[in-house]
Structure formats: C-alpha cells, structure tokens
Amino acid sequence: MVKPKRLLSLLLRLIAFGATLAAVIIMATSHEKGSFFALSYEAKYSDTPAFKYFVIANAIVTVYGFLALFIPSESPLWRLVLALDLVFTMLLISSISAALAVAQVGKKGNSSAGWLPVCGQVTKYCNQVTGALVAGFIAIITYIILLLYSIYTFLNSLLGKTPCRLSSPGI
C-alpha cells in the first residue's frame, strides 16, 4: 500500500508529467500555412528559437518527471530529486517566459518595431501555441506545489517533527 505522503507526491508528479508532455506535443505539432496579401508563408514552432527552447525544456522535464516516478520514497536519492525539482522548475519558468514574450508579439505585434500581429492570419497555429503555454503553466504551478510540499516533508523528517496543527482542540 502506498503511504498518503507518497500518494500526494505521486499524484502531483503524474499531473506535472502529463502537463509537460502535453506542452511538448501541442507546441511541436503547431503549424499552419497562411497568406498575407500576395505572400504565402508557413508558421511553425521551429521558426522561433523561444518556441524551440520551450519544447526542449519541457521535453527534458518530461523525461525527468517520468524517471522520478520510479524512485522509491525511502531512497536517499530524494535529496537529489528535491534539488532537481528546483532546477527544473526554474528551467520551465524561463522557457515559458521566453515563449510567452514571443507569443505576445505574435498576437499583438509591436508597432514600435514595425512588427505586425500574425494571429489574424494563422489562428489555428496561435491557438495551438496558447494551448501549449496553458499546459506549461499547469506544469509550473504543479512543480511549485510539489516543490513546496517536498521541502515541507523533507524538513519535517529532518527535524523529526510532525506537522504543526493550526488550531488547538477545544478552541
């Protein structure tokens, strides 16, 4: 039987794994052909370095998340997992920040630089990018919750304390 602490950690890791995998698949398959006046073009994630970085970072975290599912809770490797959770959470945050900046320019354009918005011409592509970013945000939020929970349980086990109660009986 799985311990309740391990069950919560496992559930959070499964959610994070699914979200990063979804972000990779959605972004990597995003493409659409469009035209603007007489110009024909194809919008795809691989044309943008920030989107490639997003896919690569999420793929790395997906593999890590899958492997972390199989580490026993009694293993001394959990200290390393805690440190890697922090590193990979920061990696996800940096990749989504870069991708979100490019997506914003694609949606709104930048009149100062003379960049026109493209989402009016390639709406399917922009919707796929938005879906990938939403999945990425779900992964980040899940990893932050997982990180906080892991730190909490690690410190409690390190200090030999049980979680404190917020209220006393009879109050």
UniProtKB/Swiss-Prot annotation:
Residues 1-6, 74-79, 152-171 are cytoplasmic. It holds the Pfam family CASP_dom. Keywords: Cell membrane, Glycoprotein, Membrane, Transmembrane, Transmembrane helix. GO terms for cellular component: plasma membrane. Residues 28-52, 101-130 are extracellular. The keyword Ribosomal protein does not apply. It is found in: Cell membrane. Coiled coil: none annotated. It comes from the Eukaryota. The chain crosses the membrane at residues 7-27, 53-73, 80-100, 131-151. Homodimer and heterodimers. Belongs to the Casparian strip membrane proteins (CASP) family. NCBIfam families: A_tha_TIGR01569. This is CASP-like protein 1C3.
